[in-house]
Amino acid sequence: MAAKIIDGKTIAQQVKDEVAARVTQRLAEGKRAPGLAVVLVGDNPASQIYVTSKRKVCEEVGFISRSYDLPITTTESELLALIDQLNADQAIDGILVQLPLPEGIDNTKVIERIAPDKDVDGFHPYNVGRLCQRAPLLRACTPRGIITLLERYNIDTFGLNAVVVGASNIVGRPMSLELLLAGCTTTVTHRFTKNLRHHIENADLLVVAVGKPGFIPGEWIKPGAIVLDVGINRLESGKVVGDIEFETAQERASYISPVPGGVGPMTVATLIQNTLQACEEYHDHAE
């Protein structure tokens, strides 16, 4: 029996509609619209696409969106000075610096310079630490978006064996913390993992984020598993595929997220949720 498709596009639209309704309500109450600053350094084509989509969604939900497109020659100290300025700006609730940054700029130093209550990407060590201590504030967008998908599909995660393939700071590590919080027994696999197939065949819930097309054979999927594919890979043919062999996996899983249209749309939707949360929970009282 074919798996149910986890429709990230529809759920992301629901989230955006909820945020837009709340923004309309805020304005009716005489409050300001949330503000998001999006900083792009250099001219990486993929980064430009991501940034454009983020700005577009900001406009859709009624946020104030401020763009800072800096030349590739921007120095680290110039970028840090801009972040300091945005940290102090009361009209800005969220600061997003598009990664990766050009050579010569330290990603970690830049992330740590953003005020934790404006870190809407959820990458600051303070926010990761809060998640680790089971008291999350602003949460990494892709992992939190996946949890939202599971919640909206009423999937009970308590007691499931969850396996995360990939241990990046952006997805894999925070995803493992989110799944622990959701009651899973969680395993994180990475490039040093031995017998990856064994782990995947025992996964009730599988999240794959490695950026390699078709990396996980569909036949490895445990029958009835819940499968979330974070990979977005463009083949030479132009086709966009995930990290999992979709067709075979779909025949074995109970739920599966497609690529495109699965996890991807949730990342930007969660960014918008985080910005609204930062505005309402941390910054409203300062007005």
From Swiss-Prot:
InterPro entries: Aminoacid_DH-like_N_sf, NAD(P)-bd_dom_sf, THF_DH/CycHdrlase, THF_DH/CycHdrlase_cat_dom, THF_DH/CycHdrlase_CS, THF_DH/CycHdrlase_NAD-bd_dom
Annotated NADP(+) binding sites: G166, A167, S168, I232
Superkingdom of origin organism: Bacteria
Quaternary data: Homodimer.
GO biological process, one term: methionine biosynthetic process
Pathway(s) annotated for this protein in UniProt: One-carbon metabolism; tetrahydrofolate interconversion
GO cellular component, one term: cytosol
Its biological purpose: Catalyzes the oxidation of 5,10-methylenetetrahydrofolate to 5,10-methenyltetrahydrofolate and then the hydrolysis of 5,10-methenyltetrahydrofolate to 10-formyltetrahydrofolate.
Family to which the UniProt record says this protein belongs: Belongs to the tetrahydrofolate dehydrogenase/cyclohydrolase family.
Catalytic activity: (6R)-5,10-methylene-5,6,7,8-tetrahydrofolate + NADP(+) = (6R)-5,10-methenyltetrahydrofolate + NADPH; (6R)-5,10-methenyltetrahydrofolate + H2O = (6R)-10-formyltetrahydrofolate + H(+)
Protein name in UniProt: Bifunctional protein FolD
Keywords: Amino-acid biosynthesis, Histidine biosynthesis, Hydrolase, Methionine biosynthesis, Multifunctional enzyme, NADP, One-carbon metabolism, Oxidoreductase, Purine biosynthesis
Enzyme Commission numbers on file: 1.5.1.5, 3.5.4.9
GO MF annotation list: methenyltetrahydrofolate cyclohydrolase activity; methylenetetrahydrofolate dehydrogenase (NADP+) activity
